[in-house]
Amino acid sequence: MAASNWGLIMNIVNSIVGVSVLTMPFCFQQCGILLGTLLLMLCTWMAHHSCMFLVKSASVSKRRTYAGLAFHAYGKVGKMMVETSMIGLMLGTCIAFYVVIGDLGSSFFARLFGLEVSEGFRVFLLFSVSLCIVLPLSLQRNMMAFIQSFSAMALMFYTVFMFVIVLSSFKHGLFSGQWLKHVSYIRWEGVFRCIPIYGMSFACQSQVLPTYDSLDDPSVKIMSSIFALSLNVVTTFYITVGFFGYVSFPETIAGNVLVNFPSNLVTEMIRVGFMMSVAVGFPMMILPCRQALNTLLFEQQQKDGTFTAGGYMPPLRFKILTLVVVFGTMLGGILIPNVETILGLTGATMGSLICLICPALIYKKIHKKGLASQFILGVGLLILVISTYTTLTVTEEPTQIKSELLERIDLKEEKDPEQINSQKSDEKAKVEQPGDNRDKPKLPPKNPEEEQIKGPIEGPQKEKDTKKQEEVQLDRPDQGDIAVPVGEAHRHEPPIPQDEVAVDEKKDQGEREEKKESVVDINSTEKKDKQQINLEKEPEIKDQAEANKGINEPVPQKPPQEVNDPNKQQLVNPPTPRLKEQPPFKDLEGIIKDLAVPVEIKKNAEIAEEKDNNDFANPVKAIENPPIKDEKNEQIPGDPGKESHVEPKAEDNQAEAGKAELLDHAFLLQVIKEQQVQQKRLLDQQEKLLEVIKEQHMEIHQQKGDEDQQDKLEGNIADKNKEELKAEARVAQKPLEGDKLENVGEVNAKVDKPAVEEHVVVVEKEQNPALNQVVKGNVPDVKKNDHKIEAPKINVEEVKVPISAGKHKKQSVQENLIHQQDVDQGASDNYKQREKAVAANKDYVLGHIIQQETANPIDPITLPDLQDKLGKLALHQTEPKQKPVKIAGIGEKKLGAVQEEKILVQKGQEAQADKVIQDNYNPVPDHGLHENNNADAPATINVEAKKEHIEKPKDGAVLEHDEGKQNRDLKLQNDMDLRRKKRDLALVQQENNGAQIISFHPVPNLKVNDLRGALEARLNQMVDGGLQVVQSRKIKQLIDEEKNR
């Protein structure tokens, strides 16, 4: 063989080998190694015979073109069929070239310029390549020298590409033998899909006759040897690339094998080189396609039946055809994004016609013989029908694989082949190769985790747990308090903080199910607790509304900072109840218990003076109005769960009704912060209250010693008027200190149905210290006979500003208003007598004074010096805090007499005050009871009713008996400290044998049989005459300022 023939061989090899080489590993995977090799050899044999059919037919018919042979054999029909098939084959090949350029070039240039691989970028790249590279080369008329040099470069590149594939197989375990278990050897399902690709891979029939015409000595034998050698080289190349590429990626082979390779310098060079070889090879495909179009459309038949030579075309026609072919194939490359589809479809139709069917038909027509031609014709027709159908039905699968591969190349991931295989229905179980395991250890557990994250969970479970821990561990005003989120406010156990890292929390399915059940339980308890809170609020609102009509039985309670609501304890179990059992100051325990106030009275007192709630400068207001707006919202420092549960109900009751379960974490944190601010404020207020109580306690003990000494000096004075004046002085001396503790204490009593619905006189307690003295009167059943009231027993402890009380039978409000004027007149008449009686009760010397009053009635003015001295002191101390008295329900004009006497006291007119005391003294007002009773005025308590029954205050039995009854009244409050204080009180009183006159402990209960009228006359009116006493089984005062507003 001459040396010139190698140039022809290189041209034939370059014309055969094209983009089909990239699909060889894919064909081996579809058919298996053995079956794919056999089919490749079969296609090589058929390609060789088809080429020889054309050479032999050309030598016999003296024709040198493919179309001329078809016209010689079958006329115009054959000529048109051949030309159409040739045009389709060339266009399909150009489309495949564009697809390869888009696949390889888009990823490379995107990384080079830092862009993202997208469809728009791919379109832009194809348009740029066709406009800048393909079109200039295709417009040249004489390209034979360029084509030969390009063929040499292409063959060198294909050789390098083959060695890269072989080395890649070494890297992926070729010698380890692992691939033997994963590759397929015979797979019949992919036969009809691979045969068209194989047939297209040997499509060199268009180059046969030009090569035969270019020989110096044309002969069939030389052409046979040249094509045999060329096809053997191509077959070897195809088998090498297919086998080693399949071994490298046995489970995940794309139509373009270069897509499977990881991104590195070598593979990028291979991709760019292959892309450039394809781009430069366009003119080799466009040249025959353009000539075929010219002869098909513009060639004219001559008179002798032949056609004019189609070698020359006018410039305009040449340019138009070139533009149509270039940009038409570019549009096809954009619409068909995968190379194996276009190659399979083109090979099954045009390839089978050009390579197999037409040569066999021409040879059979001209030579009239040939068994081989019939076999090749049958195979060609079979491929045309079956392979076309098979290629069209499986078009979508490679498209999905290729699009995913492009995304993986974008992200520079080497683990994408495993994800591609998951979309193939006919593949075996996925097995990872050793080289790919480094970057994929975490892929398998991600899918089950994502399936478990469902429902209201907004983010990963781990992230949510960390947010919950942050919520629980927020800063708090007190270390013992735990701020719980709204969603967990109803838990019946304190939340357990978890700082450790949760291990295997997501892997254990059982734990996840338990968590779901616990969430359902918490939601159910939330709904139940909301209903309980609503049920608790309704009776409290009703009790507050009916507070002016009937006063319920009082239950002894602790001060506001120690309020213990059993209903709230059922909902929340406070983790650290520090203030529940012991008060902050142990020695103040007895005083705090003496200040016990019923819940209803405390509420009304707070409503009456809500404007002064924040005035902590005045200790009296600070104790009267603790910084608690409502008992339902009252927070205990040791009970954070209660805080977080009640505050949202008070503020966002309607909002939480439908959204309590859908609050996001940001809202929970905001609610917790607001609760913490409120809790800090409450704690600061309570600290101030405790400081005030401590100061008052110290002042009381200091004052107690001074009063004891003063009582000893004046103990021998038997004059009743002296004692009364001295009592008045004490009433004026101790208001400033006494109010602070005693103005909070209310009269603990219960009205069955008051005779008159009292027009309650609301007094700002710090304004009139004389009215703030407390006397608790426990009046048992008071029965009314026809003409007198029986008072079998009156337990006098402390009375808060005695006020006229009504009858104890049920009467309507209209009847009460009718007799109101009589009550006012009685109040003005008995003003001074009640003033003296209250002063005596406050100093706890009631019994001693009454005894001396009964035995030694002396003229009121016997010691003017002492009287003046004490009167000045009293008026001086009471004057600074005197303010106008607010009266509810009674007009100010009706109390004119009472106000005149109050003004006399406030202005400090000593002489007038003394004169009033002297003139209004009435020692025996026995008829007062009948006068008030006949006038239907409220029955009043008279201190003189105790004259006979207080003559024996030293009797220990009476003390013990009354003390025992008092303890029975306190059974509702399970407080051991209170019982201990009461027992100590009884022992101290027995030891002193009743000699102690001034004491801060309650005076023993004293029995009274009669002298009811005297008792009512003495206590009928007070200094201001503004407050009223409701007489029933027990005495209780209700202050409600809301009615005045």
From Swiss-Prot:
Gene Ontology MF term list: L-amino acid transmembrane transporter activity
Task: State the compartments where it is located.
Answer: Membrane
Q: Region Disordered: what ranges?
A: 412-584, 606-658
Top-level division of the source organism's lineage: Eukaryota
Q: Please provide the Gene Ontology terms (biological process) for this protein.
A: amino acid transmembrane transport; sodium ion transport
InterPro entries named in the record: AA_transpt_TM
Compositional bias segments (type: Polar residues): 564-573
List where the protein spans the membrane.
8-28, 33-53, 85-105, 117-137, 150-170, 226-246, 269-289, 320-340, 342-362, 375-395
An example of a Pfam family matching this protein is Aa_trans
GO CC, any one term: membrane
In this chain, composition skew of type Basic and acidic residues spans: 412-453, 460-479, 503-546, 627-658
Question: How does the record classify its membrane topology?
Answer: Multi-pass membrane protein
The protein's UniProt keywords, in alphabetical order, are: Amino-acid transport, Ion transport, Membrane, Sodium, Sodium transport, Transmembrane, Transmembrane helix, Transport
| Function according to Swiss-Prot or TrEMBL | Putative sodium-dependent amino acid/proton antiporter.
Family per record:
Belongs to the amino acid/polyamine transporter 2 family.
Q: Report the protein name in the record.
A: Putative sodium-coupled neutral amino acid transporter 10
Q: Which gene name belongs to this protein?
A: slc38a10
